[in-house]
């Protein structure tokens, strides 16, 4: 589940930056290790995306029950229950999930994600899972990963982000189009 497709920068002979090019079509990713990512940003992602991340084994039964109850009582089954581990798998194993045609297709994928999440948690540490997730997450405008987001939205290295900048980047995951701080500056999460 390691991310693929990295961001490449081309330099002139004098060392100045010439242009940016993508190795993989549509990719915009600069990999950072977990030690290079601020703890505030890690904590913000966990708080927003999967508050029980350090307590579950890849699936969050409490979250699944909550989402199911909300779906049954409201008729709206859009409530999220995917863990960070499941989202990592979805981003890397099921990249075409948005093209699912039926609710049944979505349920089938979710079951596969849950099985794979349980298996992945046996093979990788929580830190490895979080590191890979933070390097694959779509943060708007096909900006993949936290380093690319730090560069795009704040023109700085991820390690230099302030607490408020960390919360803006983590908040983008809730709705990457709506909370894009470039196109919607008044809606910063």
Task: Show the residue positions of the predicted features.
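Peptidoglycan glycan-strand catalytic modules in the bacterial/periplasmic cell-wall system
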Residues: 7, 11-188
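Aromatic-capped interface at the extracytoplasmic side
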Residues: 1-5
């Amino acid at each position: 589940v390691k991310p693929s497709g990295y961001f490449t920068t081309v330099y002139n002979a004098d060392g100045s930056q010439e242009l940016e090019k993508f190795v993989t079509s549509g990719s915009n990713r600069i990999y950072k290790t977990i030690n290079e990512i601020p703890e505030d940003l890690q904590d913000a992602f966990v708080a927003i995306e999967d508050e029980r991340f350090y307590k579950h084994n890849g699936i969050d039964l409490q979250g699944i029950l909550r989402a199911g109850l909300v779906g049954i009582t409201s008729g709206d089954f859009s409530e999220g229950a995917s863990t960070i581990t499941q989202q990592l798998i979805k981003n890397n194993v099921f990249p075409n999930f948005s093209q699912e045609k039926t609710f049944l297709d979505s349920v089938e994928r979710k079951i596969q994600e849950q099985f794979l999440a349980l298996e992945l948690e046996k093979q990788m540490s929580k830190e490895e899972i979080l590191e890979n997730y933070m390097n694959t997450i779509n943060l708007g405008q096909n900006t993949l990963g936290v380093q690319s987001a730090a560069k795009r939205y704040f023109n700085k290295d991820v390690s230099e982000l302030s607490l408020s900048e960390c919360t803006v980047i983590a908040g983008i995951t809730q709705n990457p189009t709506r909370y894009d701080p470039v196109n919607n500056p008044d809606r910063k999460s």
